[in-house]
Amino acid sequence: MTQRLGVIGSQRNGACVLASGRPWNRDMADVLGSRTGCDFVLISDPKELTTAKLTLINPKFVFFPHWSHRIDSSIYGQFECVIFHMTDLPYGRGGSPLQNLIARGIYETKISALRCVKEMDAGPIYLKKPLSLFGSAEEIFLRASGVIENMIIEILEELPEPRPQEGVTTVFKRRSPDEGNMATAESLDQAFDLIRMLDAEGYPNAFLNVGPFKIEFSRASRKSDQVLADVRISIADNAKEKDENDKNRK
């Protein structure tokens, strides 16, 4: 049975919290509740992720399948918080893991389930599972959701002891929207990867600025000598600003 934060009851004792605001995780709490028989409480608003709310729920675990917000030390210090990161840690700590991997020509990765600690993505590892990075970002995130569901069930059933990370640490920098500019692509493969790795709800699409126009790309497919994609053409922000300034001068 899955419950929301607005519902309070003693049956919540020992429940689990699922923190994610991403659309591809929308049904995960319901699915996990059905598969495990446990109460899963979904938190999608960062403002609701407070020690007061979590104390009321008293969760065994707080799972973060896709969470881009800061987790306060009062939360991970009091509750067992498990983050799911889309790299084979300690390689690829930091932001935009999916995009940074594909930009480096890496098409197979692992999802690492780790304990939340003060240093970003540095906590001990519960387990890792493989993940393919082929397809659009939306398809990859949906695929990752299925993998993460199984990982959560394994954590609940096996209660693995998290182990320190081993290997050389590599840190990724969070990518900015400007890095989606198609002018940086030097081959059809790079153009295809740039389009698909940004093709998900909530992400800025790959784009080109041509004169006053901004051309955004999605739904790419790779052919032998070309890339096919849907395009959306709009007036670029700088062109809108110039047009507004010209009107104000008249």
For each predicted feature, which ranges?
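One-carbon transfer enzymes
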Residues: M1-K250
